[in-house]
Structure formats: structure tokens, C-alpha cells
């Protein structure tokens, strides 16, 4: 039967996505202009829900295409303007540069990171200790590198482990070329492979939560942290100190949760590394050590020095995050002899699709701001006073961040709170406390779903997710114990007065100074 033109168009539309998903996107595109004509506010919220739906269906179709079509239509029908979208991207240029350059920069340090994490896996046999190592090291790295960068590193490590095992288990040597995405090799033991997949899922989830535990602590840990720090006019050290009354107890609670879920093997955790797989990875490690040349050792040494520069540059805020990432690319490639254009291009493959998706997301933010979708929630939260106001903002941010990306939740909230400060509705000291509540509220409960955490979405849409059978639902289930513990400990730190009391102590000991409202007027308020 010949294929009709309409059938060919539908087949090509969104490629191999399920037919029901294609029809859903088409129906969204038809419905939105009609609803917008009658009620722009409802149409705006409908668009937000539809965009969240495309994020939730990330394994069916990468969200850039369906989300991008919704964003293009939103601009075309007047929900927002191209200039407002451009303004949002300009206001968040540091985040874009971070994604483009920092993630690519870490690509050229993956030999060192693969070396370190391979040693962790092969030298430490206790699954509980390995899990704690991955969680804590991810948290430490996220405090300096940005959570997205760290999860990109862990993904690289996991793909490395998986491909090594898959290659050898398929009857090939370490040096042979091999397609590790195909399971059609008769030598593979299905039970062993499933156990290894479960082991890698565990480590990736512990590492992912670790990035949230460390990422909330510093201004470079998460994209929205940079935005919040810029609005509040805080530098690296001040940001970390102000967050500490909430982030320190949350960190220890998170590490304890990691220990408990592994110890009691609940929520899909406790998967052991099969002995045969451990032997393959140990043999690979020994093979690499034996065949490591002077040139290879120099490369590892160079990458270690660049790592020191990276941490020092970020901690001392010597340049913007993206520019430090660019310096990492230049130093790593120059001193490791990578001068081929195609070799350079591979470093950008992982980050650029997500960067494009982030630009689409900023178009949705522009709609939220232009149609004032969050205004009722903000005004309701501001109607409370003192410590209760902090708790309300934490919970309101947390609930929204669970279902929508925490970057735009944090961006919208900090802008609205800053506007309230400039309008005289709140004091500067209360603004600073609210900024802490917003930052922790967007970072901690958002581990609930991949929609909230950019690093989790990055993991869900990465090459490793289908290999280890890490689906959206499975991520939500495995994140659940962390979601409950981190959210509750965070809200208790605010509710019981620890945030206000410790902040006052920091003022008294002059670790912090009181800012004036005037200090924030120089920074750009995104979306206004």
C-alpha cells in the first residue's frame, strides 16, 4: 500500500516517538491559540503544564523538539515577544556559558576522573562505602564545578565502566572496537548484566543526589544559584556562609540516608557488583596501569593541576564560571596535545542539546513573566511575616520545583522578592533570609523528579539512561527517600529558627555584614 503524503508527514514529525505522543503535541498546538484568545492566564498555565509534560516524556522524545514547537507558537501568538526571550537569555548568559564551556572543559579531564572513580570501584569492595564515596565526592565536586558538570563526569565514568564490561563479556579484548549498546552477543550473561545495570543505577542516583547536596551550598553549584547570588549581590564565601544553617544539617541527613537505603536495600538500592564484573574492571585497571606511558602520566598530572586551578578560580571568583570553563578547555587541550578540530568538537556534543533546551525553557520563563502566572502565589506568600514567611517561601518553591525546572522557579521567585524589596514591602535583612529560603527550596525538594533538577534531567536524557534501564518512574522512586528526608530537614532548619539565629550569630561575629537595599539596584533584574 503506497504511503500518502499526510502519512509521510506524520511519520517524519518527531521521528520515532509514539503516535499518541505526536498527536498529543499536535493537539496542544491547536488548543493553545484558542484558549489564549479567550483567557491568556489559563493559556499560560496550560503551556507550562504542557512543557512539563514534554520534560516528563524525555525518554519518548527529547524535549527540545516538542517543547521548542510550543515555545515558537507561544511567541507567534503573542504570549511573549522575541525581545523578552532574548532578554531572558541575556540575563542568564552565565548559565549558558557554563553549559557550553564548563561541561566541555570537564570532558578533557575525564581521563583523570575515570582513573579516580575506577580506583574507587576496584579498591573498595563494600557497596555501602562505594555509595558513600560517590555521594560525598559528587557533593564536594558540585560545590565547585556545578552539578551539571559533575553529573556529566559521572555519566562518562559509568559509560566507561559499562563499555569495558560489555566489550570483555562479549569475548573481545580491551583494545577492540565494540558496540556496547547492542545486547545481541551470545556470550553475555543476562543475570550478570542486569545486576551490573542495577549497581550503576544505584551509583548514578547516589551521585545525582550528591550533586544536589553539594550544589545547594555554593553560588556555582546550580544554575539558579548564580542568578540568586547576582540578585542579592553575594560573592562565593558569603553565599556559602548564608546557606550553611540549612545546608550543613541537610548534607549530613543526605549522607545518612545514602547509608540507610544501601544497608537495608530499599527503594531499589543495595544492588551488588557481580564478582565477574569486578574482576573485569580490576583487570582493566591493572592493564591501564601496566600500559600507562610517560605521556599518559603527564596528561593525568596536567589534568590534576587544571583541577586545582578550577577549584581555586571558582572559590576566589577570579572570572565568571563560563570563562573559567573556557580556560580549562584551552589549558587541557594545549598541554595534552589535542589540536584537531574534530577531537575538540566531541567535547561539545553532550552539552549543546541541553543548552538549546535551556534556551527554549527561557522562552517559557518569558511567558510566565509576561502573563504574571506566578503573581498570585507570590502575593499570597508575601502576606505572611517573619519566620512563617520563610517557611511558606521554602514550601512554595519546593512544591513548584518538584514539577518544574528549579532554574525558572528560582529565577521568577528571586525577581519577585527583589521587586518587593525595592517597593519597600520587605527589609533588606528579610530579603537575604528569603533568598536563602528560595535557594534551598528550589534545590532540595526538586530531587523528587527529573523535571526539577537540571542534572537529573541531563542524566535521564543521556546515553547511559537506556543502557542501564533508568526510566523516569524509576528515578522518581529511587529519589523518594532522599526527597522526604532533604525536604523535611530543610524546612525544620527554617521552621525551628536555626536560619534566623545562625544568621544573627554571623552578623554578631562579623562573618557577615548587613547589606542595604541600595546594594541590589545595580544588578540586573531578569524579566523586568
UniProtKB/Swiss-Prot annotation:
Annotated catalysed reactions: 2 Na(+)(in) + 3 H(+)(out) = 2 Na(+)(out) + 3 H(+)(in)
Compartments, as annotated in UniProt: Cell inner membrane
Keyword Transmembrane assigned: yes
Membrane topology: Multi-pass membrane protein
Gene Ontology MF annotations: sodium:proton antiporter activity
Main localization (coarse): membrane
Function recorded in the entry: Na(+)/H(+) antiporter that extrudes sodium in exchange for external protons.
PANTHER family for this protein: NA(+)_H(+) ANTIPORTER NHAB (PTHR43302:SF1), TRANSPORTER ARSB-RELATED (PTHR43302)
The name this protein goes by in its record: Na(+)/H(+) antiporter NhaB
UniProt organism field: Shewanella halifaxensis (strain HAW-EB4)
Gene assigned in the entry: nhaB
Amino acid at each position: 500500500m503506497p504511503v500518502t503524503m499526510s502519512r509521510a508527514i506524520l511519520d517524519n514529525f518527531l521521528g520515532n516517538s509514539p503516535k499518541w505522543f505526536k498527536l498529543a503535541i499536535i493537539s496542544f498546538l491547536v488548543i493553545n491559540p484558542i484558549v489564549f484568545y479567550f483567557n491568556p492566564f489559563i493559556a499560560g498555565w496550560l503551556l507550562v503544564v504542557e512543557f512539563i509534560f514534554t520534560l516528563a516524556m524525555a525518554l519518548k522524545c527529547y524535549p527540545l523538539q516538542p517543547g521548542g514547537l510550543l515555545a515558537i507558537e507561544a511567541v507567534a501568538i503573542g504570549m511573549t515577544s522575541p525581545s523578552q526571550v532574548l532578554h531572558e537569555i541575556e540575563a542568564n548568559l552565565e548559565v549558558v556559558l557554563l553549559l557550553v564551556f564548563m561541561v566541555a572543559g570537564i570532558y578533557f579531564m575525564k581521563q583523570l576522573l575515570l582513573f579516580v572513580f575506577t580506583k574507587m570501584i576496584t579498591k573498595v569492595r563494600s557497596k555501602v562505602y562505594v555509595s558513600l564515596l560517590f555521594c560525598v565526592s559528587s557533593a564536594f565536586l558540585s560545590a565547585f564545578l556545578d552539578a551539571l558538570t559533575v553529573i556529566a563526569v559521572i555519566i562518562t565514568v559509568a559509560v566507561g565502566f559499562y563499555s569495558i564490561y560489555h566489550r570483555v563479556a562479549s569475548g573481545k579484548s580491551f583494545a577492540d572496537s565494540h558496540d556496547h549498546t547492542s545486547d545481541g552477543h551470545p556470550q553475555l550473561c543476562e543475570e550478570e548484566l542486569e545486576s551490573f545495570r542495577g549497581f550503576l543505577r544505584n551509583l548514578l542516583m547516589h551521585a545525582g543526589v550528591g550533586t544536589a547536596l553539594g550544589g545547594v551550598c555554593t553560588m556555582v553549584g546550580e544554575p539558579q544559584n548564580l542568578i540568586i547570588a547576582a540578585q542579592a549581590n553575594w560573592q562565593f564565601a558569603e553565599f556559602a556562609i548564608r546557606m550553611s544553617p540549612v545546608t550543613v544539617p541537610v548534607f549530613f541527613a543526605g549522607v545518612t540516608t545514602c547509608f540507610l537505603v544501601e544497608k537495608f536495600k530499599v527503594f531499589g538500592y543495595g544492588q551488588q557488583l557481580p564478582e565477574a564484573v569486578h574482576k573485569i574492571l580490576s583487570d582493566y585497571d591493572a592493564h591501564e596501569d601496566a600500559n600507562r606511558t610517560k605521556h599518559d602520566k603527564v596528561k593525568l598530572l596536567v589534568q590534576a593541576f587544571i583541577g586545582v586551578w578550577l577549584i581555586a578560580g571558582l572559590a576566589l571568583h577570579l572570572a565568571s564560571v563560563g570563562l573559567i570553563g573556557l580556560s580549562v578547555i584551552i589549558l587541557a587541550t594545549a598541554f595534552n596535545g589535542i589540536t584537531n578540530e574534530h577531537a575538540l568538537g566531541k567535547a561539545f556534543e553532550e552539552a549543546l542539546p541541553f543548552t538549546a533546551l535551556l534556551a527554549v525553557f527561557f522562552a517559557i520563563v518569558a511567558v510566565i513573566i509576561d502573563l504574571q502566572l506566578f503573581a498570585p502565589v507570590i502575593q499570597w506568600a508575601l502576606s505572611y511575616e517573619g519566620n512563617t514567611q520563610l517557611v511558606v517561601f521554602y514550601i512554595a518553591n519546593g512544591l513548584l520545583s518538584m514539577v518544574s525546572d528549579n532554574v525558572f522557579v528560582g529565577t521568577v521567585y528571586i525577581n519577585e522578592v527583589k521587586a518587593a524589596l525595592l517597593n519597600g514591602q520587605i527589609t533588606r535583612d528579610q530579603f537575604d533570609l528569603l533568598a536563602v529560603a528560595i535557594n534551598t527550596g528550589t534545590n532540595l525538594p526538586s530531587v523528587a523528579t527529573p523535571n526539577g533538577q537540571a542534572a537529573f534531567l541531563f542524566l535521564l536524557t543521556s546515553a547511559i539512561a537506556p543502557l542501564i534501564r533508568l526510566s523516569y518512574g524509576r528515578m522518581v522512586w529511587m529519589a523518594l527517600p532522599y526527597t522526604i528526608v532533604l525536604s523535611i530537614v530543610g524546612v525544620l532548619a527554617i521552621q525551628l529558627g536555626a536560619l534566623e539565629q545562625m544568621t544573627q550569630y554571623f552578623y554578631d561575629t562579623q562573618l557577615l555584614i548587613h547589606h542595604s537595599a541600595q546594594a541590589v539596584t545595580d544588578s540586573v533584574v531578569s524579566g523586568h
